[in-house]
Protein backbone atom coordinates (compact mmCIF):
# COMPACT_ATOMS: atom_id res chain seq x y z
CA UNK A 1 0.00 0.00 0.00
CA UNK A 2 1.07 3.57 -0.66
CA UNK A 3 1.87 5.29 2.66
CA UNK A 4 0.44 8.65 3.66
CA UNK A 5 1.80 11.50 1.50
CA UNK A 6 3.02 13.53 4.49
CA UNK A 7 4.99 10.60 5.86
CA UNK A 8 6.55 9.94 2.47
CA UNK A 9 7.87 13.50 2.26
CA UNK A 10 9.78 12.92 5.50
CA UNK A 11 11.12 9.40 4.93
CA UNK A 12 13.82 10.12 2.30
CA UNK A 13 15.31 12.55 4.84
CA UNK A 14 14.82 10.61 8.06
CA UNK A 15 15.91 7.19 6.79
CA UNK A 16 19.58 8.06 6.03
CA UNK A 17 19.82 10.04 9.26
CA UNK A 18 18.43 7.10 11.21
CA UNK A 19 20.80 4.66 9.51
CA UNK A 20 23.77 6.82 10.49
CA UNK A 21 22.85 8.03 13.97
CA UNK A 22 19.86 6.02 15.25
CA UNK A 23 16.55 7.91 15.49
CA UNK A 24 14.94 7.74 18.95
CA UNK A 25 12.31 10.51 19.01
CA UNK A 26 10.42 12.46 16.37
CA UNK A 27 8.36 15.62 16.73
CA UNK A 28 6.72 17.03 13.60
CA UNK A 29 4.37 19.84 12.66
CA UNK A 30 3.01 19.48 9.15
CA UNK A 31 1.73 22.15 6.78
CA UNK A 32 -0.41 20.29 4.27
CA UNK A 33 -1.62 21.58 0.91
CA UNK A 34 -5.21 21.73 -0.28
CA UNK A 35 -4.54 19.14 -2.99
CA UNK A 36 -4.02 16.57 -0.24
CA UNK A 37 -7.82 16.62 -0.01
CA UNK A 38 -8.14 15.95 -3.74
CA UNK A 39 -9.63 18.05 -6.52
CA UNK A 40 -12.40 19.15 -4.19
CA UNK A 41 -9.77 20.66 -1.90
CA UNK A 42 -8.09 22.76 -4.58
CA UNK A 43 -11.45 23.82 -6.01
CA UNK A 44 -12.65 24.98 -2.60
CA UNK A 45 -9.47 26.97 -1.98
CA UNK A 46 -9.73 28.52 -5.47
CA UNK A 47 -13.34 29.57 -4.83
CA UNK A 48 -12.41 31.13 -1.51
CA UNK A 49 -9.47 33.06 -2.98
CA UNK A 50 -11.71 34.30 -5.81
CA UNK A 51 -14.29 35.50 -3.29
CA UNK A 52 -11.59 37.37 -1.40
CA UNK A 53 -10.26 38.93 -4.62
CA UNK A 54 -13.76 40.19 -5.39
CA UNK A 55 -14.09 41.62 -1.90
CA UNK A 56 -11.97 43.54 0.58
CA UNK A 57 -8.82 41.43 1.02
CA UNK A 58 -6.93 44.13 2.89
CA UNK A 59 -9.85 44.40 5.29
CA UNK A 60 -9.02 40.92 6.59
CA UNK A 61 -6.07 42.51 8.39
CA UNK A 62 -8.41 43.76 11.12
CA UNK A 63 -11.83 42.23 10.45
CA UNK A 64 -12.53 38.55 9.81
CA UNK A 65 -15.91 39.51 8.33
CA UNK A 66 -14.39 41.77 5.66
CA UNK A 67 -14.79 38.98 3.09
CA UNK A 68 -17.86 36.80 2.69
CA UNK A 69 -16.35 33.41 1.90
CA UNK A 70 -18.39 30.59 0.34
CA UNK A 71 -19.55 28.06 2.91
CA UNK A 72 -16.68 25.60 3.49
CA UNK A 73 -17.25 21.96 2.59
CA UNK A 74 -13.93 20.12 2.97
CA UNK A 75 -12.92 21.96 6.14
CA UNK A 76 -14.81 23.32 9.12
CA UNK A 77 -13.62 26.88 8.44
CA UNK A 78 -12.37 28.73 5.32
CA UNK A 79 -8.84 27.72 4.30
CA UNK A 80 -7.97 30.82 2.25
CA UNK A 81 -5.86 33.33 4.24
CA UNK A 82 -6.09 30.91 7.16
CA UNK A 83 -4.70 27.72 8.68
CA UNK A 84 -6.80 24.79 9.88
CA UNK A 85 -5.29 22.75 12.74
CA UNK A 86 -8.22 20.34 13.02
CA UNK A 87 -9.49 18.97 9.72
CA UNK A 88 -9.42 15.24 10.36
CA UNK A 89 -11.18 12.74 12.61
CA UNK A 90 -10.15 12.92 16.25
CA UNK A 91 -8.80 9.66 17.63
CA UNK A 92 -7.08 8.47 20.77
CA UNK A 93 -5.79 11.06 23.23
CA UNK A 94 -6.95 13.96 21.06
CA UNK A 95 -4.76 13.08 18.06
CA UNK A 96 -6.33 13.11 14.60
CA UNK A 97 -6.26 10.13 12.27
CA UNK A 98 -3.68 11.95 10.13
CA UNK A 99 -1.41 12.44 13.14
CA UNK A 100 -1.75 8.78 14.08
CA UNK A 101 -0.86 7.76 10.50
CA UNK A 102 2.28 9.87 10.76
CA UNK A 103 3.23 8.00 13.93
CA UNK A 104 2.30 4.49 12.79
CA UNK A 105 3.74 4.73 9.28
CA UNK A 106 7.01 6.29 10.49
CA UNK A 107 7.44 3.37 12.88
CA UNK A 108 6.66 0.82 10.16
CA UNK A 109 8.81 2.28 7.38
CA UNK A 110 11.82 2.86 9.62
CA UNK A 111 11.44 -0.52 11.35
CA UNK A 112 11.15 1.15 14.76
CA UNK A 113 7.97 -0.17 16.41
CA UNK A 114 8.66 1.72 19.63
CA UNK A 115 9.73 5.04 18.10
CA UNK A 116 8.37 7.98 20.09
CA UNK A 117 6.45 10.20 17.68
CA UNK A 118 4.30 13.27 18.30
CA UNK A 119 2.78 15.26 15.46
CA UNK A 120 0.40 18.12 14.71
CA UNK A 121 -1.08 18.19 11.21
CA UNK A 122 -2.26 21.53 9.85
CA UNK A 123 -3.94 22.36 6.54
CA UNK A 124 -2.58 25.53 4.92
CA UNK A 125 -3.70 27.62 1.90
CA UNK A 126 -1.17 26.14 -0.51
CA UNK A 127 -2.26 24.32 -3.67
CA UNK A 128 0.37 21.56 -3.76
CA UNK A 129 3.32 20.62 -1.58
CA UNK A 130 3.35 19.32 1.98
CA UNK A 131 5.88 20.78 4.42
CA UNK A 132 7.13 19.48 7.76
CA UNK A 133 8.99 21.13 10.60
CA UNK A 134 10.88 18.24 12.18
CA UNK A 135 12.66 17.91 15.52
CA UNK A 136 14.52 14.59 15.62
CA UNK A 137 16.57 13.08 18.43
CA UNK A 138 19.24 10.42 17.85
CA UNK A 139 21.17 7.86 19.88
CA UNK A 140 24.52 9.31 18.88
CA UNK A 141 25.75 12.90 18.59
CA UNK A 142 25.36 14.49 15.16
CA UNK A 143 26.23 17.97 13.93
CA UNK A 144 24.24 20.00 11.44
CA UNK A 145 27.18 19.89 9.03
CA UNK A 146 27.38 16.09 9.23
CA UNK A 147 23.63 15.79 8.63
CA UNK A 148 23.69 18.14 5.64
CA UNK A 149 26.60 16.27 4.09
CA UNK A 150 24.72 12.99 4.50
CA UNK A 151 21.50 14.40 3.05
CA UNK A 152 23.29 15.94 0.08
CA UNK A 153 24.18 12.39 -1.01
CA UNK A 154 20.82 10.80 -0.17
CA UNK A 155 18.74 9.58 -3.13
CA UNK A 156 15.66 11.67 -3.85
CA UNK A 157 16.78 14.50 -1.57
CA UNK A 158 18.06 17.99 -2.35
CA UNK A 159 19.45 20.42 0.23
CA UNK A 160 18.15 23.97 -0.25
CA UNK A 161 18.56 27.26 1.55
CA UNK A 162 14.82 27.95 1.56
CA UNK A 163 12.70 24.80 1.02
CA UNK A 164 9.23 25.87 -0.10
CA UNK A 165 6.22 24.13 -1.65
CA UNK A 166 5.78 26.49 -4.60
CA UNK A 167 9.23 25.74 -6.02
CA UNK A 168 8.93 21.99 -5.33
CA UNK A 169 5.60 21.58 -7.13
CA UNK A 170 6.05 19.18 -10.04
CA UNK A 171 9.39 17.84 -8.80
CA UNK A 172 10.24 14.30 -7.73
CA UNK A 173 12.82 15.12 -5.06
CA UNK A 174 12.06 16.29 -1.55
CA UNK A 175 13.73 19.49 -0.39
CA UNK A 176 15.35 19.87 3.03
CA UNK A 177 16.86 22.93 4.66
CA UNK A 178 17.13 24.96 7.87
CA UNK A 179 19.22 22.08 9.27
CA UNK A 180 20.51 22.98 12.73
CA UNK A 181 21.21 21.58 16.17
CA UNK A 182 18.19 21.37 18.45
CA UNK A 183 19.09 23.32 21.57
CA UNK A 184 16.21 21.75 23.54
CA UNK A 185 17.30 18.10 23.34
CA UNK A 186 20.47 16.03 23.41
CA UNK A 187 21.68 14.74 20.03
CA UNK A 188 18.85 16.60 18.32
CA UNK A 189 18.40 18.18 14.90
CA UNK A 190 15.82 20.57 13.51
CA UNK A 191 14.95 20.42 9.81
CA UNK A 192 12.36 21.76 7.38
CA UNK A 193 11.23 19.35 4.65
CA UNK A 194 9.02 19.94 1.59
CA UNK A 195 7.69 17.49 -0.99
CA UNK A 196 5.15 17.51 -3.81
CA UNK A 197 2.34 15.43 -2.31
CA UNK A 198 0.98 14.56 -5.77
CA UNK A 199 4.32 13.10 -6.90
CA UNK A 200 6.56 11.72 -4.15
CA UNK A 201 3.56 11.57 -1.86
CA UNK A 202 1.38 9.65 -4.30
CA UNK A 203 1.99 8.91 -7.99
CA UNK A 204 5.79 8.64 -7.99
CA UNK A 205 5.83 6.61 -4.81
CA UNK A 206 3.26 4.18 -6.23
CA UNK A 207 5.46 3.67 -9.30
CA UNK A 208 8.54 3.10 -7.12
CA UNK A 209 6.66 0.54 -5.01
CA UNK A 210 5.53 -1.28 -8.18
CA UNK A 211 9.10 -1.30 -9.52
CA UNK A 212 10.38 -2.71 -6.23
CA UNK A 213 7.77 -5.48 -6.31
CA UNK A 214 8.73 -6.36 -9.89
CA UNK A 215 12.40 -6.55 -8.87
CA UNK A 216 11.49 -8.85 -5.96
CA UNK A 217 9.51 -11.08 -8.33
CA UNK A 218 12.60 -11.47 -10.50
Report each predicted region and the residues it spans:
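Active-site-lining helix/loop region of Rossmann-like oxidoreductase modules
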Residues: 8-150
Amino acid sequence: ANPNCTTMAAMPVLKPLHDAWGLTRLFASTYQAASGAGVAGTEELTEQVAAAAAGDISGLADDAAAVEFPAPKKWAVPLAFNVVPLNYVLGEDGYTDEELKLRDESRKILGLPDLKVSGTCVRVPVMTGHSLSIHAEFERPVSAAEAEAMLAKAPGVQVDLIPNPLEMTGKDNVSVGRVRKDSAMDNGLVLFVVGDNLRKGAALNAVQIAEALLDMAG
